């Protein structure tokens, strides 16, 4: 069976940049077909009309990715697919909607470290936006958060292939859960990855203060700039964690086989099995 995976993106979080590629990293899986629609940077309720385009694909499972899934726009987008298996991927503020998501039968993966950006005009230009997201992606990839997302979605795909009612994930991705998925062998690498995740989590608090609470530019500009510096340092720590594992030849890799099976290996020159 070929499982049809629909991805709807509203607004920007780090996970949205790569979520569909986490499922088919070499573009050779034969068990899934993927379509992606997006409203771009905007996420007002009227932008949820892009869901109609995805409905034409008739997906077997829908992934809705957005910042703050508690907002009206993302809510309208996921509710357009009520009755289908829907997985919401969002950031820490979406925890406000956790109970509602459970009640309505939606799956969710909420990633604490996928923090909001410092969206003040005096500070954020396209280059700064791209650099921030590059740092977020490195943190989420190297700590294990992306692997946790990938494996949770793959499990749903496997359930659908087996003709079972899929068990949708209900996960809040913490530092501990991320590094567990990261499968670090070296304790110092694990500690650096945890430090990276914790710092990245804190970025959101500072950017919220800089974007929504402080009104004086003399105060909010340094705040959002400092938050971005923190994410940069988090990315460096995440990179250092992976470098330690590389030096010991213990980087865990879990590529997909053509049939979608998740393989595994640690030694670089070993064959994944």
From Swiss-Prot:
Gene Ontology BP, a term: one-carbon metabolic process
Temperature and activity: Optimum temperature is 70 degrees Celsius. Thermostable up to 90 degrees Celsius, however, only in the presence of salts.
pH dependence: Optimum pH is about 5.5.
Signal peptide (from-to): none
Catalysed reactions, semicolon-separated: 5,10-methylenetetrahydromethanopterin + oxidized coenzyme F420-(gamma-L-Glu)(n) + 2 H(+) = 5,10-methenyl-5,6,7,8-tetrahydromethanopterin + reduced coenzyme F420-(gamma-L-Glu)(n)
UniProtKB keywords: One-carbon metabolism, Oxidoreductase
MF annotations from Gene Ontology: ferredoxin hydrogenase activity; methylenetetrahydromethanopterin dehydrogenase activity
Keyword Transcription regulation: no
Enzyme Commission identifier(s): 1.5.98.1
Pathway: Metabolic intermediate metabolism; lactate oxidation
HAMAP family (alphabetical): MTD
Family assignment from sequence similarity: Belongs to the MTD family.
Function in brief: Catalyzes the oxidation of methylene-H(4)MPT to methenyl-H(4)MPT(+).
Name recorded for this polypeptide: F420-dependent methylenetetrahydromethanopterin dehydrogenase
Gene assigned in the entry: mtd
